[in-house]
Amino acid sequence: MKLRPLHDRVVIRRSEEESKTAGGIVLPGSAAEKPNRGEVVAVGTGRILENGEVRALAVKVGDKVVFGPYSGSNTVKVDGEDLLVMAENEILAVIEG
C-alpha cells in the first residue's frame, strides 16, 4: 500500500529510537523517548493559499527533518511500518550535510 498525503501534509518515517542514554544506561522501550527526527517519504501537492494558488512545499522526499515532540500525532501503519502524517508547518528544520 502506498500513502499519498493531501495538500500541505507530509509523511515521515521516524528515525530509530535510542535505547541507551549518553551515560550508557539501557532504557526499556516504554522509558525511551521517541526521536524527533525522521526522513520524508511522501509530500502533498502544496498549501492552498487564500487566492486559490498552490504554494509548493519547502521539503521534498528524502529530506532528513526535525520536528517537535508533539508533532505528527497521526500515526499510520503501512506495510507493517509506522509512519507519521503531519502538516509541513510542524517540521522545525531540514538537516543538511
Swiss-Prot record:
Keywords in alphabetical order: Chaperone, Cytoplasm
Any Gene Ontology CC annotation: cytoplasm
Primary site of residence: cytoplasm
GO molecular function: ATP binding; metal ion binding; protein folding chaperone; protein-folding chaperone binding; unfolded protein binding
SUPFAM superfamilies documented for this protein: GroES-like
Localisation: Cytoplasm
GO biological process entries: chaperone cofactor-dependent protein refolding
Subunit structure: Heptamer of 7 subunits arranged in a ring. Interacts with the chaperonin GroEL.
Record family assignment: Belongs to the GroES chaperonin family.
Function in brief: Together with the chaperonin GroEL, plays an essential role in assisting protein folding. The GroEL-GroES system forms a nano-cage that allows encapsulation of the non-native substrate proteins and provides a physical environment optimized to promote and accelerate protein folding. GroES binds to the apical surface of the GroEL ring, thereby capping the opening of the GroEL channel.
Name recorded for this polypeptide: Co-chaperonin GroES
Source organism per UniProt: Pseudomonas putida (strain GB-1)
Name of the gene encoding the protein in the UniProt record: groES
